[in-house]
Regions:
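Glycine-rich beta-alpha loop elements in corrinoid/cobalamin-binding modules
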Residues: 1-65
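Conserved structural-core and active-site-/substrate-pathway-adjacent residues in large, well-folded domains
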Residues: 6, 45, 108-109, 113, ...
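Flexible loop/turn segments at secondary-structure boundaries
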Residues: 16-18, 53-55, 110-114, 122-125, ...
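Structured alpha-helical segments in the cores of large, soluble enzyme domains
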Residues: 17, 101-109, 133-141, 168
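N-terminal [4Fe-4S]-dependent radical SAM core
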Residues: 48, 54-102
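Ferredoxin-type iron-sulfur electron-transfer modules in oxidoreductases and energy-metabolism complexes
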Residues: 92-93, 126-138, 142
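Canonical Radical SAM [4Fe-4S] cluster-binding loop centered on the CxxxCxxC motif
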Residues: 95-130
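Conserved SAM/AdoMet-binding glycine-rich loop
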Residues: 134-209
Length: 209
């Protein structure tokens, strides 16, 4: 990986980015190797040039060894377990999904279908609470736009998704267009379809495709 990546962050940005950005600012102007060594000491930060792959006689990878004792032998993925997931911080008509406030409802998926990278790369399955996580995240963006996107590999499997739907069915959201990312076929209900239709959705993506 070293010819392509200087640094790889393993895990969730909520944990990785604050320390990573602070370290970059502290190291501004430092020699390249010093910067890479310092970054490699942060939890969840992998610097490929400071490690070497080791293979057996058949060419099978058996280990990835650190080239210096200053970096950890293994880099552990960092897993965010807070009560909030990500949501849009910049809302603009120039975005790929223009003028829409995105809110992450779930991270990963409990089904773990073998073909689905979204499930495995972001394990474990996590859900923020409705009152302290999702509702504040939704309201944070609706002052800037009346378009809301609910994101996740299987948003309808949030344990409080029905309550979220009822909350979004209030009259004060009558002018808000709501769309959802993929949902499992078994979780599509008449209530879900009706509320989404009333909020401007014309289609949904159903998994497994």
């Amino acid at each position: 990986m070293a010819p392509f990546f200087d640094v790889v962050l393993l895990g969730d940005g909520e944990l990785l980015l604050p320390a990573f950005i602070d370290a970059l600012q502290e190291l501004r102007g430092s020699p390249r190797r010093e910067r890479l060594l310092r970054l490699a000491q942060l939890p969840g930060v992998y610097v490929p040039s400071l490690y070497a792959p080791r293979y057996d006689s058949d060419g099978q990878l058996i280990a990835i060894d650190p080239l210096t004792a200053e970096v950890p032998a293994q880099v552990a993925k960092q897993t965010w377990r807070g009560n909030t997931l990500s949501h849009s911080t910049v809302i603009t008509p120039e975005a790929a999904w223009p003028s829409i406030h995105m809110v992450e409802v779930v991270r990963s998926c409990p089904e773990l279908c073998r073909f689905c990278l979204a499930s495995y790369l972001t394990l474990p399955f996590r859900t923020p609470s409705l009152d302290d996580g999702l509702i504040p995240a939704v309201e944070a963006g609706l002052g800037a736009t009346r378009r809301l996107g609910l994101l996740g590999a299987s948003v309808t499997q949030h344990p409080q998704f029905d309550e979220l739907l009822q909350w979004l069915n209030q009259e004060r959201f009558a002018d808000t267009r709501i769309s959802v990312s993929s949902v499992r076929a078994a979780t599509v209900t008449h209530e879900l379809a009706s509320i989404l239709a009333r909020r401007g959705s014309k289609s949904i993506t159903i998994a497994i495709e």
